[in-house]
Amino acid sequence: MRIVVNLKPEEIPKHWYNVLADLPFKLDPPLDPETKQPISPEKLSVIFPMSLIEQEVSEERFIEIPEPVLKEYAVYRPTPLIRATFLEEYLQTPARIYYKYEGVSPTGSHKPNTAIAQAYYNKIEGVKRLVTETGAGQWGSALSYAGAKFGLEVKVFMVKVSYQQKPMRKYMMNLFGGKVTPSPSEETNFGRKILSEDPDNPGSLGIAISEALEVAVSDPNTKYSLGSVLNHVLLHQTVIGLEIKKQLELIGEKPDILLGCHGGGSNFGGTILPFVPDKLSGRDIRFVACEPAACPSLTKGNYDYDFGDTAGLTPLLKMYTLGKDFIPPKIHAGGLRYHGSAPIIARLVKEGLVEAQAFDQDETFEAAKIFAKLEGIIPAPESAHAIAGAIREAKKAKEEGKERVIVFTLSGHGLLDLTAYV
């Protein structure tokens, strides 16, 4: 019988967990690209509301989740932790495999966890419109939904190759009131520059971020919203890992391995960060970031300061990067086609606290198809990387005869990504 671990509605975490309070080292600060000195909050306030800037630099261990955000979380949280018994039987592994399913959210992924929070903080500071980028459309859909909830206009630049591959995402964003433009576009100076140099450019998250930032800085009523990478985004996503902790405690399990797909780091960070203090205190637990071999920022990138976008408009961030001009191949996992990585995750990799593994598209989709047939959930192409990672680890446990507890986050469903499976 399938084991599903559900928490009660009142058990939704009331605070986000801030790992910066517990790390034995300080992160390198974001730098002003003009002065190469730590960037001032005043400069960041052009694109972000001050409350999110404060969260970005906070070292407070727990940050209270505002009541209006909790009210919206309660629409779909807590999310279930499910034991993958059919997958275990198929693999004939002694490992116990659990997955945290974030696809039950209104837009089908983990992205509303931060979209709702960001929309709320922008709303209370008087912002009228949010502008953002999106790869596969999961983030754009989540922000469009959150904008509708809090009465904000939302403008989305969607990476062109994903815009063409995933038309249903555009329809979902439109349904929630979001206005979507394929990127690179004719709507911004940077977009026009890219198209003049390469009319067939497939786009990238770096380019789409540049276009969104250009719009944000030109309108005082508009702020920029980012779906991954930054500290405050990972902070909001820790509701995932905090719930996993409670759910595992309910059934008397302790994880040996935690996995998540990795593009910018929000889903992976949200999964593992609440467990980092356990590892720092000596517990034997592995964190595995699963990224596409076609965009291997953690496994093949350089650890250095780089821009978060292609035009060089963002602060310089210390991270693993393939270079701001890197244009990834047209893989189906559009949400993972990012040249950089979250500074928090990058530093954890650098310190040896997090492992990174790369997966090619064939292995990833083979894992996704097996999972769909056995567990009854069609995973998003991005999320399928975590499944591939879990299968690798389960096979290794079988070879070694170890009863390991493997936990991964299934960050979203793939019902709007079905063309990827053809």
Swiss-Prot record:
Domain of life: Bacteria
The name this protein goes by in its record: Tryptophan synthase beta chain 2
GO MF terms, alphabetically ordered: L-serine hydro-lyase (adding indole, L-tryptophan-forming) activity; pyridoxal phosphate binding; tryptophan synthase activity
Organism of provenance: Thermotoga maritima (strain ATCC 43589 / DSM 3109 / JCM 10099 / NBRC 100826 / MSB8)
InterPro entries: Trp_synth_b-like, Trp_synth_b_CS, Trp_synth_beta, Trp_synth_beta/beta-like, TrpB-like_PALP, TrpB-like_PALP_sf
Lyase keyword on record: yes
Keywords: Amino-acid biosynthesis, Aromatic amino acid biosynthesis, Lyase, Pyridoxal phosphate, Tryptophan biosynthesis
PANTHER family the UniProt entry points to: TRYPTOPHAN SYNTHASE, TRYPTOPHAN SYNTHASE-RELATED
Summary of subunit composition and partner proteins: Tetramer of two alpha and two beta chains.
EC number: 4.2.1.20
Post-translational modification N6-(pyridoxal phosphate)lysine, affected residues: 111
Cofactor names: pyridoxal 5'-phosphate
